[in-house]
Amino acid sequence: MTRTWAPAAVVLLVAIGAIEARVSAQQLGESVGPPRLESAGLMLTAAGLLASAFVYLVLGHLAQDDRAAVRAGALTGALAGLVGGTVRAFIIDGPVADLVARYAAVPEWFVPGALAVFVALACVVSAVGGGALAWTGRRLSRAARSRPPA
């Protein structure tokens, strides 16, 4: 059952990340002065994190067993981290390069290198977090089903 939902989960996770990156890029492009953590950016990040966590929890709920949940969550996370991280990197490349150029003289390879590290970390963190959250979703669904009637 999880195999049929994993591609949809990847698409949802990539879309969540792309929306978040587009809004962040717009905020960075409009900023004057050094970047600051604002409530709108904080709320956007929190909403994206909650939506992503929900996708992984549902994926785990649909899994047949604990092992399948961890595997589906980790593989979905790795793929979503790779594809979504790359999409995010392309979206925020311009605004980040402009922001860095305002405050520092760095080699041309610096921003693309930093974004490549971002993609690699997104892949790893999404795989680990996805596996853990999917396992949690499986455990929560199993606990809800095994309760005795009141």
Predicted regions mapped to residue ranges:
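Juxtamembrane/disordered regions of integral membrane proteins
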Residues: 1-150
